[in-house]
Amino acid sequence: MRITSEQAAAIRQEVTRLAGDAARVWLFGSRVRDDARGGDVDLMVELDEAVPEPAQLAARLSAQASRAMWGRKVDVLIKAPNLQTLPIHSIAMTEGIRL
């Protein structure tokens, strides 16, 4: 995994602050592969309750996670009961690492 434990903790803290204690966060994409270089940070936040404004939540989470990653670009997917589940959500859960 190509983020530090401090960065992972900061991301978890921001996800909890913005999405609640029950939120689960997954790191996926190139950052889970130690042999990869560069790349943005891909996160999926999984929630048990409906999200009324998922785009706003994703944008807030992305901005806060980017700060924790020293300005690195962070893409955030939201998985919630009221949102369509896409193949990328399954990829994030099967190939990703839960933070």
What are these regions (language model features)?
Residues 1-24, 32-38, 48-99:
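Catalytic core of pol beta-like nucleotidyltransferases
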Residues 42-46:
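Short, aliphatic-rich beta-strand segments
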